Amino acid sequence: MTTTATPTDEIDAIIARHVAREGPLLPILHDVQAAFGHIPDDARAPIAAALNITRAELHGVISFYHDFRDTPAGRHVVRICRAEACQAVGANALSEAVLGKLGLDWHGTTPDGRVTVEPVYCLGLC
């Protein structure tokens, strides 16, 4: 008989890999997001318990860092620069056109799960 790892098993394994390190929270969050595409609610209680922090503290870290997600991103993530230099050459019009065409707000994902649109600041491509 073969066994299949559950999401809980995978979360526990990720925590175990990092918990003894100094400053384990961000590596744990990065690995959980890499495994699931976002930080699932099911992962929050075990992470908080393992690190002896509150779920509110954990939520504060997740919401502070823009790269962590509460929900899975679309198959394609479109990042549009919001920095001043890009705004000066039409980024606002571009973002309004993209968001309008897709019927999304920033960080939104199309209903079919294909596209997520995110703001970023200075991609260094201008």
Map each language-model feature to its residues.
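Signature of N-terminal electron-transfer/Fe-S-associated modules in redox systems
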Residues: 1-125
